[in-house]
């Protein structure tokens, strides 16, 4: 029986390296299922997506993954979710929805919402993002993409660029990279540096971490560059956003002049203006491969949780 069977997925911190390796290994098997067009191993199972804050890619990725394994999907999102949030508390919502499904995928603007939902329900809860806190399945697909592109994670020099203060993807990813022994380079304006509690946590697990303000200076040394957008909606102070927006821009010229030919550029998407469109044509650009890998990894995760692998 898989260690993921009937398990909640709330934070990367809930998993050991061995467990993450189990998921990555199963994703390799699931990629072959994906390439065959899927199968029906989760027939009769129902996934509920509850999205109380905006999402396109994550929600569609989970729904696609479930359908490709023969399962069904019910959804609450958009205006309907906003209305529900106003008239019914989260606890009542998840306690109701658990009777309609076998697994819940939840996105909520409040940090800790996914953990609360998991404590209240008997069906597994998967965190699809809770405020600026965690986004574990994005980290899983990021790890899988890096492993596919580079053949390993340990020892790689990986740069995390952009909003490291409010960006939940990098909060999850930095911890996972540390578990695998990657060398982490944090690149951001002073105002958007990684929160001190995360830096302290990385230090406690023996991570090799360096902070930088200048992308051009460190770029030639990187194996992977993970770019994040600066999200207006994450800033409690609009003036702070205005001060830091547009702090970094990855251009074709920058990559061609300063990056290694085997650099891998990743981005959780959507982007704003932090990666110029003509970078897409470069061999280093792998962010659309991430999208494909996201479906595969979520297929693997759902199979391990609901089918036991």
Swiss-Prot record:
One of its GO terms (molecular function) is amino acid binding. InterPro entries: Asp/Orn_carbamoyltranf_P-bd, Asp/Orn_carbamoylTrfase, Asp/Orn_carbamoylTrfase_sf, Asp_carbamoyltransf, Asp_carbamoyltransf_Asp/Orn-bd. SUPFAM superfamilies: Aspartate/ornithine carbamoyltransferase (SSF53671). The keyword Ribonucleoprotein does not apply. It catalyses: carbamoyl phosphate + L-aspartate = N-carbamoyl-L-aspartate + phosphate + H(+). One of its GO terms (biological process) is 'de novo' pyrimidine nucleobase biosynthetic process. L-aspartate binds at residues 86, 168, 229. Carbamoyl phosphate binds at residues 57-58, 107, 135, 138, 269-270. Pfam families: OTCace (PF00185), OTCace_N (PF02729). Heterooligomer of catalytic and regulatory chains. This is Aspartate carbamoyltransferase catalytic subunit. The gene is pyrB.
